[in-house]
Amino acid sequence: TAYYDAMIANWFNKKLKIEFPERKTIFGRKLQQLRYGENPHQQSSIYVNDYNDKHLKFDQIHGKELSYNNYNDMFASLEILNSLKKNSGTVIIKHANPCGVSENKVPLISFKNAYASDPISAFGGVIACNYKINKKIALEINKNFLEVILANGFDKDALNILKKKKNLRIIDISNFNLKNLSSIKTFDGSFLVQSKDNIVIDKKKLKCVTKLKPTKKELAEQTGRGRKSTTK
């Protein structure tokens, strides 16, 4: 009954566009019991909100069950991917931090450039692409060890190639939508809630207010908000 009442309350908040009500109920349905958390000694599960019809709209086509760290890296990759142009973006994540990001109207070049950014860190990482994976890209992917590949679809030849690696988790994100979600951080019975930082930056609308002007290379970077640290 409490679960049902909470769903009704959240539905009305959404309908009335009340993003931050005086009382907020956070609840979820267990989607999966995970083997362990960030470390082997930690327990972990993943939950989803039934009132949000856009939650985790992706399909796992192949591979082992997703782990806590897989999900964490996937979420980080999708947040950055959301800021890149459609059908051109590639993001590589390791330990929730980007180690390769690229945009190119030719998907194969986009993939190669992203991987070339830091091939050592990319080892055992997660790759997210907002384009469809074809045979040529699949052959490049299989040259490397990766935990997860997320993409906006896979053609038949690509799937046949990728499935040769039995442990590679293949995720179709064709129906995934990151917009209109909230970000929540918890600590000791309290939680911080904010709207998601999913604005796509329009360089034409940027205004420099300092004497030092950014270079074209600096403006091209889309990974700042995806980093856990800005130190080098």
What are these regions (language model features)?
Residues 3-232:
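ATP-dependent carboxylate/acyl-activation modules
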